Amino acid sequence: MEREIYTSDRNPDSADTSWLSKLGPGLITGAADDDPSGIATYSQAGAQFGFNLLWTVLLTYPLMVAIQLVSARIGRVSGHGLATNLRRHYPPSLLYGVVILLLVANTINIAADLRAMGAAVNLLIGGPARAYTVALCAISLTLQIFVPYRRYVRVLKWLTLVLFAYVGVVFAVRIPWSTVALRTILPQFSPSADYITTLVAVFGTTISPYLFFWQASQEVEELNATEQQPLVKKPAQSAATLGRIRVDTVVGMGFSNVIAFFIILTTAVTLHAHHVTDIQTAAQAASALKPIAGNLAFFLFGVGIIGTGMLALPVLAGSAAYSMAGTFGWKNSLALDAQLAKRFYGIIALATIVGLALDFTSLDPIKALFWSAVINGVTSVPIMVLMMLMATNPNVVGTFVAPLTLRILGWLSTAVMAAAVFAMFLFL
């Protein structure tokens, strides 16, 4: 982020701070991963294949933690977001290509999430879904532009609680826990195009480029908000700060994967068990639950769609704005007044409004989401490669090179995503 960095000997990441206070960028990033588009993907996985894709949560968790840790470390150690570091250390053509693909994918995701949120309100209380979509868009945009950063982050933290709705759904249905445990540890693979495509979609939903940009930039926001310096300039703070990042990321990604597990589990034990196997939207999943699992499950699922959408929209729009601002060296911070960072907030508004506009076109939301997943997958691999290179580049991180275990897991995560992209194109 291009803004003044203040100095202080006080370290808010020190051991005497509360455990909950250590949760911030990682928690919000992990929760935002379970957006309405992700909910639709996990719902389809459970509805179509029952318990047989629960194992993916066990695989993606350590990989997701590793790559998000790399992202967070780059931001906190260097004092700059991913796009700024790419601009400073890599060819412009590579940066421009990555950012354009990110903008396209994020805008389509915003459109899909807004539509799902409007449909969820319609399911719960009736009325015009499109009017709800517009209203929710306006509320989200107003919060992003006019609410001060520290208060805004507290709002996002509270919104993560809505994800427990998907845990609550489990208590409304009967779960064969022994079978669940068996299928999670010993899954039954199906070498079919549908199985591979859904598997790729789950990987692509779980490990997404916008999460990389958001968490790195949020670490810089936290650095500035607490009047700290980057670790390359203040190495004495590294133990406490990197420890806080570890806790935050491990908990945040764990939260994300637990919720994903419960969404797959809920739809498997309800929809799949009743031969409802074609779920294409989150709202459709909520609607299908009602006659099978009852009003409570339906209500919790619907509320979850709205809450996760409100959490994910600022992450999608914000990561697009951070990437553009970092690319061109603009002022960028949610802590800055909109008048002081007009272009940064302009991108947030533009991405959100264009996403809303797409909902009033003939664009097929399911096809749009599919191609968004393709773009996300294609974009994530080169970004992950560049992140792993930055994490070991002394020009970026100084002496804070990623440790061996993190490098191994980071490259493994990159290899899994590359294989997923290859499989995606193989079955297109």
Task: For the regions a language model picked out, list residue spans one by one.
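Flexible loop linkers connecting adjacent transmembrane helices
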Residues: 2-8, 41-44, 69-94, 119-121, ...
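Transmembrane alpha-helical segments of multi-pass small-molecule transport proteins
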Residues: 99-100, 124-146, 162-171, 340-354, ...
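Hydrophobic alpha-helical segments and their helix-loop junctions in multi-pass secondary transporters
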Residues: 161-188, 192, 205-221, 386-395, ...
